Amino acid sequence: MTFTKAAPGAAFVTAIRAMLLRDMGGCISPVHAFIFLQGLETLSLRVERHVENALKVVQYLNNHPQVERVHHPSVSSDPEQQALYQKYFPNGGGSIFTFEIKGGKETAKKFCDNLELFSLLANVADVKSLVIHPASTTHAQLSEEELNEQGIYSNTIRLSIGTENIDDIIEDLEGGFQSV
């Protein structure tokens, strides 16, 4: 970019601003920095709760008759993956994972729509539990073949487990299963 052509009257200032934003990013205000630091102080506690809840949900889903398969490192049948999981995640894996519900696309969508505690959102790692049907939302632009290549099927559901009471989370999931 030529700044003398883009902003002839303020080329130097524009160049400095553009380079600073590109190289260093935007600067947050003091208030936002304070809020960020406040959240950082409790991050380890929140992650601990996320992981603890996720492991319980994974076990619940892994034993549920309406679930085809759970994709989480804690339930892998591959001995090599289990060894890596134990080595790198001694306190448990992440709180974001997918599972396949028995049935097709409509079953998966109905399950998601009937959850009450879970929010139907595309973002992840929130304090609240989130659910989404990737094939009809975040990956809707892909063909069925492309989805399958990425391990996303019409019955795949992605969960991001939050910090709510685990009994409430499992009760909500059970309500979703009862609706299908």
Regions found by a protein language model. Give the residues of each.
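Active-site C-terminal subdomain of aminotransferase-like
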Residues: 1-96, 100-128
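PLP-dependent enzyme catalytic core of the Aspartate aminotransferase-like
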Residues: 113, 129-180
